[in-house]
């Protein structure tokens, strides 16, 4: 729980450009994880799928808060 709050605090300190880069990095990592699971038949750490998706959602929420679309 503390790690989530720490991540949210770090995300709120970032600028919109940095948030966009963070989202892009996480989407890229999620895509490569999906490709690895589908193509290489390797054992993939399944918890990483939800971690990346949640990080993307958190950062997009913070981005919308900064743009004024969400009251926060």
Curated annotation (Swiss-Prot):
HAMAP family membership: Ribosomal_uL29 (MF_00374)
Protein name (record): Large ribosomal subunit protein uL29
Organism encoding this protein: Chlamydia caviae (strain ATCC VR-813 / DSM 19441 / 03DC25 / GPIC)
A Gene Ontology BP annotation from the UniProt entry: translation
GO function terms (MF aspect): structural constituent of ribosome
Gene Ontology annotations for the cellular component aspect, listed alphabetically: ribonucleoprotein complex; ribosome
Domain of life: Bacteria
Entry similarity comment: Belongs to the universal ribosomal protein uL29 family.
Record has Methyltransferase as a keyword: no
């Amino acid at each position: 729980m503390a790690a989530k709050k720490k991540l949210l605090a770090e995300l709120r300190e970032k600028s919109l450009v940095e948030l966009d880069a963070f989202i892009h990095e996480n989407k890229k990592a999620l895509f490569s994880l999906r490709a690895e699971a589908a193509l290489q038949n390797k054992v993939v750490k399944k918890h990483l799928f939800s971690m990346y998706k949640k990080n993307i959602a958190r950062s997009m929420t913070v981005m919308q808060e900064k743009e004024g679309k969400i009251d926060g």
